[in-house]
Amino acid sequence: MDFLTLAKQRCTTRGFTGRRIEKEDLDKILEAGRVAPSACNRQPQQIIVVEKPENIKKVEKAYKTFGSTCVLIVCQNKSDPLIRPFDGKCSGDLDIGIICDHMMLAARELNIGSVMVGLFDPAIVRKEFGIPEHIEPTALLLLG
């Protein structure tokens, strides 16, 4: 499928079937995120894959998961951020958006639904998953 067709077919999914994501498909989605461009190729992302039902329940304390069986907690490493000198803007949020977009498009190509969530409580996610202070939970990517 050509890119524009793929981009047009990608849509937000807020109701998942409960179908498990195959390891091979998950690996392809994660690889798409790994090769996504980032400012100065800093690759600030650290991704936590959540599949066990008891861990999905931990995510649900911060935001609903709509029946997703796989949640990617997309974090950025803040220990060495790339800061724009003119106004102090960190490139990490933009980078994470690009990385998530790559993974959502890869999921769509595999006929897997997705939704990127930014409106969640990162403090809850940090606590539930023991995420250190220099790693910032930035987005949730729900798959199914």
Segments from the language model and where they lie:
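Short secondary-structure junction motifs
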Residues: 42-45, 112, 138
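A glycine-rich helix N-cap at a beta->alpha junction
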Residues: 67-72, 130-144
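Small-aliphatic-rich amphipathic alpha-helix that forms the alpha element of a beta-alpha
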Residues: 33, 72, 87-128
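Glycine/small-residue-rich phosphate/adenosyl-binding loop
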Residues: 25-99
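Residue-level "edge-of-site" marker
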Residues: 46, 120-122, 139
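Short catalytic-loop micro-motif centered on adjacent basic/acidic residues
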Residues: 15-16, 46, 113-116
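A generic local secondary-structure boundary/capping motif
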Residues: 60-63, 127-131
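Specificity-determining recognition surfaces
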Residues: 1-25, 140-144
